[in-house]
Amino acid sequence: MKKTILGILILSCLGLSLFAGGQKQQASGPATLTLLFYSPELQSQYNDMVAAYKAETGVTLDITVAQTDFRSILSSRINSGDIPDVFMSSAYADNTTYKDYVYDLSKEDFIRSLSPSALEGVTVDGKILGYPFLVQSHSFIYNKKVFADNGITNLPRTLAEYDAAAQKLQAAGIQPFATGFREFWVLPQTAWQAIAPVVVKKYGGYAGFVDRLNKGTLKFSDVLEMTNVFDLLDLIKKYGGAKPNESDFNDQTSLIATGKAAIIHQGNWAEDTIRQINPSADLGFLVGPVGNDAGAAGIMFDSNQTIRIAKDSKNLQAAIAWLRWLTTSAYGKDWIPGKIKQLSPIAAAAAPQSQIAEETVSMLNKGVPGYPWFYQMFPTGTEQELGAILQGYCAGITDRQATLTALDAAYAKIAKAAQ
């Protein structure tokens, strides 16, 4: 996720104390902030920001970047009392998970510079429990040159149209999909997109749907449209090369960059990695199929990756100042669109020079459905657990019914533990 897609803080005035309200600086020199982030594909951008912040303020950002083991590292540090000054998480359900540990940003002046829609996923009962890092989209990315060279001019919107395009590509010797199935987070992102509109049409909205799942009054096995999920995963696997279950993020980005594969399910965060391999790659964005309902096909669009400040940090004011810098300084406002090349939560920020970001905005402006990342409302821990179950399905270990049974059991167990 990288998931998944996900801002950063600093002093707004260089000569001032790191602490507000008359508090004294705890050390003779500038503070050192500890940060625990994920998205290792952004390591160079993190490093650039760290260097810029150090140069402007003298404050050191001691940043650790993890990915697959991120949650276990964060949980271990929280349980041991070694909470980072600043850490990342998802939005939505993670607001509840970390509410006892994080600082409420609602009274900070710089928060008013953020887009109200970006704040929805971090707001609970009027409290703003995190800082939306990136505004991201995920769906199917395609190589425009490969499509054009093989005469695919009508972009697919339905499962049948994806199948027809894949057949044509495979007949030409092109691998239609690079699956990414080895990454636990790719499968949930792919799967839940296939039922996103169903949640609203049949279950009264995302919050209501998740509430019923949490209470056990609804199960995945009750949702008839889960066939959309299995049909889509089967299609990707069928046209996903000789070893679809061994494909990871690096495989996806490499194959689409070099034109050896035509389509990947990923987010706009993948573009920078693709361009490191092929700077001139011509990329486009496709809607994700919802069975064969062309009108329901859309993209997933939200701000999920979240920065949180530990409320009991000894460097609390320094951490708040860093976020203020991220939001208001020239470098901070340009960091996401200019360096990360993604959409910023800052309302007045410039648009990034990114094909996928530009296509995202264009599609939404033309009325293409943009669905929120509602699966991030599921209890913390479900993404990896349910992703592993879907990996088992794609590997042929379980059939559809056994997979639904496993999804129901895993969700119920995690939801009960979260109560």
Regions found by a protein language model. Name each.
Residues 3-9, 13-94, 101, 110, ...:
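Conserved N-terminal structural module of periplasmic/extracytoplasmic solute-binding proteins
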Residues 51-52, 56, 60, 80, ...:
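Extracytoplasmic/periplasmic substrate-recognition and gating elements
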Residues 62, 300-301, 338-345, 359-413:
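C-terminal capping/gating helix-and-loop segments adjacent to ligand/active sites or protein-protein/ligand interfaces
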Residues 65-73, 159-163, 244-258:
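Short helix-initiation/N-cap motifs at beta->coil->alpha
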Residues 84-85, 112-147, 175-179, 296-299, ...:
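A structural signal for short loop-to-beta-strand junctions that line the ligand-binding cleft
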Residues 90-139, 148, 163, 169, ...:
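Hinge/lid segment of periplasmic solute-binding proteins
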Residues 138, 163-215:
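Extracytoplasmic/periplasmic solute-binding protein
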Residues 167-168, 210-245:
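Glycine-centered hinge/linker elements that transmit conformational signals in sensory
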